[in-house]
């Protein structure tokens, strides 16, 4: 909160020349024809008499939008201080913040977008910047390296101001993800905004510093201030060719104002790069360094982001053949694109005597890159057989070099009766270089630059009794919002594929003989829920019949089905479990020339885990890290916080900063590491939201050596993680578990559907984490998820409680949805007023604080020490009417 106050203080106190406040700064500069020139050598002489247009008439009336606020979803993140507009559609969960405005809202403001509604692309936390101490360093191949203060940038150079349309290279990516999942998240068609930017020319700054000639310096590199979790923990950086940076026709600026106000935190306060006609990924925010160099930027993000790879290239091939480093795959200038905005998604046009008497007006936007003017937009109602030319509106005037940096708007009138006979409408645009849009979508690994025809389906509906209407269906809706004809089409295709590939079990009784021998190739064929075989210490086991009874759920077996899992089995199972396994033994493994040796395989694995890691940046084949439950995912520790003397919050970076973990709510992961030459695996439930991008967080209690006489060695994995240095790798495997919360009270338990309007939750100690995950999911989906939750949380003392602060905050904010009762064995601090229970969780506690069962609408979720569950919780719930087989879900 203090950071937000400090930001407001900075932009109102002294971020500008001493005689100008932010809103008055426009007057200071424009009154002198664009700002007083400090050095005639810094700018072209033909700019002396140029007077920039007064853009205030465009953006001032449109700044009146409802205020941005601190979003509760940001409370537990490093962005808690940043105010954001509530209308923005979040695309990547809580953090980092990536969003776009709803398309109808965006278009309602016309040419200039209010800053609070401008789309946002952040890779990590928003830096807390101080105008008075912020500097931009210019170094490298320059004669006079300088660190400019913001005061020096504002007062030392001629200011320029003009509108620019910014577009993310991932605009319309969700359409690509409906065809095949790319490595990026779901941008809709709203990743575009136009605002008026004020700043200083980059070429003026470079010339002031004595930039060397093109023969010596070929590139200008930019680096931001934010420390990012992915890509080896580097800062965001990229570069431009020197010829672009120094070209007066390109209008590259270092911007410090947007729509007449200082930059907002999400948009780069106090200064950022603006490169008109380029993708947003080249416009570094929170600019700290400019390096003139011979070579391109060495930043991870310069090579591993903003590329269009050929459609046949997946992540594995991209890494193997170094496609990331091929210059022809780099995106700089925007391509030609257009979108239908009217009719809107789910808009209904009634067909009656009134509506058929006048034409319907279709509308939309179009843009192109490199300053190229959009010269024509066409609409078709018959799949491209015929086209109707639209009216174009270009609110901007070209620059003196003939460049167009902004979007334009198109409209066309169509007869309603024509719409009645059409199945879809589509739009395409042309620019002055005669570039146009392809008819069909061209998939690429990163889901970038999608610009196929924008198609809206037309369906007949009955909006009112006895009335016929047309309902319009856009391809997708942004983020995780449902809707769109592409989503429905994908669902139908998936269902048909699933029905066509279902097979009956191939696990047959005659295999149950210990004398049988199998090769590894034969074992690999049994890797499904219909037939799940594993190899442990050279023995082959058919675990198919045990899937439904496994305490950890079927997933724990299925992630290893068809493989030799000796090391993983030993890492997490007791001698008793090994004895139980024998009843499922069907034979022995024989090794052929084409099969590997389990012993050598285990030795090799240990050697690999112990060996120093070679960091090879790569992008995943999927937008989720846990795309294949059978494969371990290498993650790196990027942050570790001590929450108490024995509780740590670990943050691990996923392989790609644009990935989600891919863990369904209710399931957990295995963390794998080699300690003492042996594989150690432990199950943990992340506390980070399933929507988090680029990282996963685990809250873990450390069981130290010699603290508990029953376990003198302490916790092997927890102590290992506590000693793990930043940057060190661990492997994560999953998802694992038999319980999945699908939202709005729906659960899947071992493949069966369950539903509840009320949840009776009981947790003990670290067993709070899966329960916490469900609470988080329910509250995140408000107001759609109306599930009522009652939680009893037991610990030895108050200090042993995990996540209490957040649970209390949720309960206070949602008193009708979440009711919490704590129980401690003893009050650790008698001087503190303890208003909850003391003692053990028994039937009386459960009856007082949980709803009764047996009504078909209440489920119990339980996780904690086995003694607590078996001796008190389960018997108590049974007496309260819960069917322990159907109504009591144990994580």
UniProtKB/Swiss-Prot annotation:
Residues 630-742 form the FAD-binding FR-type domain. This is Nitrate reductase [NAD(P)H]. The gene is NAR-7. PROSITE patterns: CYTOCHROME_B5_1, CYTOCHROME_B5_2, FAD_FR, MOLYBDOPTERIN_EUK. The lineage of its organism: Eukaryota, Viridiplantae, Streptophyta, Embryophyta, Tracheophyta. FAD binds at residues 682-685, 699-704, 711, 716-718, 769. Its cofactor is FAD; heme; Mo-molybdopterin. GO terms for cellular component: organelle membrane. It comes from Hordeum vulgare. One of its GO terms (biological process) is nitrate assimilation. Heme binds at residues 550, 573.
């Amino acid at each position: 909160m203090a950071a937000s106050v400090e930001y407001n203080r900075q932009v109102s106190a002294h971020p500008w020349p001493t005689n100008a406040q932010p809103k008055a700064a426009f007057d200071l500069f424009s009154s002198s024809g664009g700002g007083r020139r400090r050095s005639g050598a810094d700018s072209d002489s033909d700019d002396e008499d140029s007077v920039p247009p007064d853009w205030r008439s465009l953006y001032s009336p449109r700044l009146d939008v409802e205020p941005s606020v601190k979003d509760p979803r940001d409370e537990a993140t490093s962005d808690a201080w940043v105010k954001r507009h509530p209308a923005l559609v979040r695309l990547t969960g809580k953090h980092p913040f990536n969003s776009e405005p709803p398309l109808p809202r965006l278009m309602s403001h016309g040419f200039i977008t209010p800053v609070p509604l401008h789309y946002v692309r952040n890779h990590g936390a928003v830096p807390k910047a101080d105008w008075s101490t912020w500097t931009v360093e210019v170094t490298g191949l320059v004669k006079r390296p300088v660190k400019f203060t913001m005061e020096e940038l504002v007062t030392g150079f001629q200011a320029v101001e003009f509108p620019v349309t910014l577009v993310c290279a991932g605009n319309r990516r969700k359409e690509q993800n409906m065809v095949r999942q790319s490595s990026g998240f779901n941008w809709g068609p709203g990743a575009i905004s136009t605002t008026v930017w004020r700043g200083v020319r980059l070429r003026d700054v470079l010339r002031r510093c004595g930039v060397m000639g093109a023969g010596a310096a070929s590139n200008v590199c930019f680096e931001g201030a934010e420390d990012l979790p992915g890509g080896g923990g580097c800062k965001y950086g990229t570069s431009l060719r020197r010829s672009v940076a120094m070209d007066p026709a390109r209008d590259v600026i270092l911007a410090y104002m947007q729509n007449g106000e200082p930059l907002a935190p999400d948009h780069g306060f106090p200064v950022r790069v603006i490169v008109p006609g380029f993708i947003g990924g080249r416009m570094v925010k929170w600019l700290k360094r400019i390096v003139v160099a011979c070579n391109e930027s060495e930043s991870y993000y310069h090579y591993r982001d903003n590329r269009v790879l050929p459609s046949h290239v997946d992540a594995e091939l991209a890494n193997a053949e170094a496609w990331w480093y091929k210059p022809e795959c780099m995106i700089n200038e925007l391509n030609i694109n257009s979108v239908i905005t009217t009719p809107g998604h789910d808009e209904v046009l009634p067909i009656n005597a009134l509506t058929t008497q006048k034409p319907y007006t279709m509308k939309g936007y179009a843009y192109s890159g490199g300053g190229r003017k959009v010269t024509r937009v066409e609409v078709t109602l018959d799949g491209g057989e015929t086209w109707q030319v639209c009216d174009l509106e270009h609110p901007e005037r070209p620059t003196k070099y003939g460049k167009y940096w902004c979007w334009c708007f198109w409209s066309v009138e169509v007869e309603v009766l024509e719409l009645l006979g059409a199945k879809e409408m589509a739009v395409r645009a042309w620019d002055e270089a005669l570039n146009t849009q392809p008819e069909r979508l061209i998939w690429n690994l990163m889901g970038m630059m999608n610009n196929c025809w924008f198609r809206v389906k037309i369906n007949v509906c009955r909006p009112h009794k006895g009335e016929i209407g047309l309902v319009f269906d856009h391809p997708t809706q942004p983020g995780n919002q449902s809707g769109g004809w592409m989503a429905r089409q994908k669902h139908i295709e998936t269902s048909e594929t699933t029905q066509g590939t279902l097979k009956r079990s191939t696990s047959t009784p005659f295999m149950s003989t210990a004398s049988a021998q199998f090769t590894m190739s034969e074992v690999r064929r049994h890797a499904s829920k219909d037939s799940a075989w594993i190899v442990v210490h050279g023995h082959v086991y058919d675990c198919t019949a045990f899937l439904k009874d496994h305490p950890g759920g079927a997933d724990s077996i299925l992630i290893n089905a068809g493989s030799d899992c000796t090391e993983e089995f030993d890492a997490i199972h007791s001698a008793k479990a090994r004895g139980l396994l024998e009843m499922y033994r069907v034979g022995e493994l024989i090794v052929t020339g084409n099969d590997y040796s389990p012993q050598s395989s285990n030795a090799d694995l240990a050697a690999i885990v112990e060996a120093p890691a070679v960091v090879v940046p790569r992008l995943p084949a999927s937008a989720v890290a846990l795309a294949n439950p059978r494969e371990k995912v290498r993650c790196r520790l990027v942050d570790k916080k001590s929450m108490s003397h024995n509780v740590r919050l670990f943050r691990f970076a996923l392989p790609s900063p644009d990935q989600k973990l891919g863990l369904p709510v209710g399931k957990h992961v295995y963390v794998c590491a080699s300690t003492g030459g042996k594989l150690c695996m432990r199950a943990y439930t992340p506390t980070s939201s399933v929507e988090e991008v680029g990282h996963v967080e685990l809250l873990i209690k450390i069981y130290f050596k010699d603290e508990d006489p029953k376990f003198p060695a302490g916790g092997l994995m927890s102590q290992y993680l506590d000693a793990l240095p930043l940057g060190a790798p661990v492997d994560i495997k999953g998802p694992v578990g038999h319980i999945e919360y699908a939202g709005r009270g729906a659960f899947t338990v071992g493949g069966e559907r369950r539903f509840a309007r009320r949840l009776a939750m009981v947790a003990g100690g670290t067993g709070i984490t899966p329960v916490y995950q469900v609470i988080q999911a329910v509250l995140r989906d408000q107001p759609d998820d109306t599930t009522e939750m009652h939680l009893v949380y037991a610990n030895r003392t108050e200090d042993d409680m995990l996540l209490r602060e957040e649970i209390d905050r949720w309960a206070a904010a949602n008193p009708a949805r979440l009711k919490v009762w704590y129980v401690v064995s003893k009050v650790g601090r008698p001087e503190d007023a303890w208003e909850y229970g003391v003692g053990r969780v028994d039937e009386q506690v459960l009856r007082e604080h949980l709803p009764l069962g047996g009504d078909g609408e209440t489920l119990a979720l339980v996780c904690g020490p086995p003694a607590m569950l078996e001796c008190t919780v389960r018997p108590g719930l049974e007496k309260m009417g819960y069917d322990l087989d159907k109504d009591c879900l144990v994580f």
